[in-house]
């Protein structure tokens, strides 16, 4: 597969990681784009996030901010939006949860987690299948 056309359309290609300052690999740049991250600007430089640093950052968030379990209904009331309109990210990989992933939480009575500054986190399909990553601690 030729990655030249991809490099022109991906805003993360050629950027460094915000935390480790290493250049993003093509896979990391692609993941940033697919997970709908925003390019971060610090001191005039543009940054993305490599997978290792992102997962370390999310693990630190889980350790430092004890999450409070909330239902989908409570999350809606807290933010004044329907679950479908809320931006909820995975607490393990940082990807945006799809409507189906949010509805899976409700269907299986798996709570979302309210963390720092009322940020709502959940688990995406990739991070909850096969029991590979537990529910939010």
UniProtKB/Swiss-Prot annotation:
GO CC, alphabetical: host cell cytoplasm; host cell nucleus
SUPFAM superfamilies noted in UniProt: E6 C-terminal domain-like
Gene Ontology terms describing biological process: DNA-templated transcription; regulation of DNA-templated transcription; symbiont-mediated perturbation of host apoptosis; symbiont-mediated perturbation of host ubiquitin-like protein modification; symbiont-mediated suppression of host innate immune response; symbiont-mediated suppression of host type I interferon-mediated signaling pathway
Domain of life from the UniProt record: Viruses
unnamed Zn finger ranges: 17-53, 90-127
Gene3D superfamilies: E6 early regulatory protein
Subcellular location: Host cytoplasm; Host nucleus
Presence of the UniProt keyword tRNA processing in the record: no
The keyword Hydrolase belongs to this UniProt entry's keyword annotation: no
MF term (GO), any: zinc ion binding
Record key words, sorted: Activator, DNA-binding, Early protein, Host cytoplasm, Host nucleus, Host-virus interaction, Inhibition of host innate immune response by virus, Metal-binding, Modulation of host cell apoptosis by virus, Transcription, Transcription regulation, Viral immunoevasion, Zinc, Zinc-finger
UniProt subunit comment: Forms homodimers. Interacts with ubiquitin-protein ligase UBE3A/E6-AP; this interaction stimulates UBE3A ubiquitin activity. Interacts with host BAK1. Interacts with human FBLN1.
Described function: Plays a major role in the induction and maintenance of cellular transformation. E6 associates with host UBE3A/E6-AP ubiquitin-protein ligase and modulates its activity. Protects host keratinocytes from apoptosis by mediating the degradation of host BAK1. May also inhibit host immune response.
The family this protein is said to belong to: Belongs to the papillomaviridae E6 protein family.
Protein name: Protein E6
Organism: Bovine papillomavirus type 1
